[in-house]
Each structure stands twice: as C-alpha cells, then as structure tokens.
C-alpha cells in the first residue's frame, strides 16, 4: 500500500521536513508515505492542474479541507486497515493558501478535515503524517497511541 501526500508549498521550514521525515521513516515498507510538493501558483485552478498530474494512477483521493468531514484517529486506523486489505493506494491532497480548487474536491472520493481550526499547509502536512503513523501503531498494538 502506498500513501501519497500531494501538498502545495515548497521550501518548507526545516522543522516541517524534520518532523515529516521522522514519522515517514517509522512506517513499514508495505505502508510507505511519499510527499509530492507542488509549487504554489497564482490561482487554485492552475494549482489544480499540477495537483491532478501528481496523483498516482488508480489511487483513491481524499481532499483535505476545513469544510470536510471530521475524522477520529480510530476511524483513520479502521480506514487504513481496510485500504490495506483491499489493496488500495491513497492520495491525500493539501491545498495552498487559497485551499483546493473545487474540481479537486468534487473528484475526490472523500473530503476530510484534520481540525475545526484553519491550519497552515505546513502544519497540516506534519499533522497528517503523524496521524497516519499513529493509525498504523493502533493497528499494530504499538504503545505509541494511548487512550
């Protein structure tokens, strides 16, 4: 199973690269995470073309948006288990300063939000990678996640 994060933004601060790399390297080889950075453009429509081109063929798409459906970590773990069992690759989309173009949200299989708060895309990237790792640890019975 391959998890891809297509995120608008480049030249992230060092702390973003450090944090995302730390969680990515903890993931097993059969559940890898790849981040594809898209250079910001003047309009979401122009970004949408670049984002769509970065989505791996056959991947299911989840658009992250502040108006998306709330998720829990437990639900993410359940989803992750299902995707692995069914052999799906998943791509998460993180928009830039103006969010995702409506066409990307319409074509996505789901639209989620990471928080009721509006997050900068750098923070959303770190939060998503951490939650994917946390979901994986739940499935493995690893003590990282505590309730």
Swiss-Prot record:
Pfam families associated with the record: SPOUT_MTase
Enzyme class name: transferase
Residues involved in S-adenosyl-L-methionine binding: 64, 95, 114-119
Transmembrane segments: none
Top-level taxonomic group: Bacteria
UniProt catalytic activity: pseudouridine(1915) in 23S rRNA + S-adenosyl-L-methionine = N(3)-methylpseudouridine(1915) in 23S rRNA + S-adenosyl-L-homocysteine + H(+)
Compartments it resides in: Cytoplasm
GO molecular function: rRNA (pseudouridine-N3-)-methyltransferase activity
Role this protein plays: Specifically methylates the pseudouridine at position 1915 (m3Psi1915) in 23S rRNA.
Subunit structure: Homodimer.
PANTHER family assigned to the protein according to its UniProt record, in alphabetical order: METHYLTRANSFERASE, RIBOSOMAL RNA LARGE SUBUNIT METHYLTRANSFERASE H
Similarity comment: family membership: Belongs to the RNA methyltransferase RlmH family.
Annotated protein name in UniProt: Ribosomal RNA large subunit methyltransferase H
Species annotation: Polynucleobacter asymbioticus (strain DSM 18221 / CIP 109841 / QLW-P1DMWA-1) (Polynucleobacter necessarius subsp. asymbioticus)
């Amino acid at each position: 199973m391959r998890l891809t994060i297509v995120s608008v933004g480049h030249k992230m601060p060092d702390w973003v690269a450090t944090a995302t790399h730390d969680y990515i390297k903890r993931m097993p080889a059969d559940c890898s995470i790849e981040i594809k950075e898209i250079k910001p453009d003047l309009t979401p429509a122009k970004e949408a073309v670049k984002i769509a081109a970065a989505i791996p063929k056959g991947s299911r798409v989840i658009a992250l948006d502040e108006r998306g459906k709330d998720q829990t970590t437990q639900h993410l773990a359940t989803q992750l288990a299902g995707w692995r069992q069914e052999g799906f690759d998943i791509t998460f989309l993180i928009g830039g300063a103006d969010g995702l173009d409506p066409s990307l949200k319409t074509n996505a299989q789901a639209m989620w939000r990471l928080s009721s708060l509006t997050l900068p895309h750098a923070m959303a990237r770190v939060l998503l990678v951490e939650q994917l790792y946390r979901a994986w640890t739940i499935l493995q019975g690893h003590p990282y996640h505590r309730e």
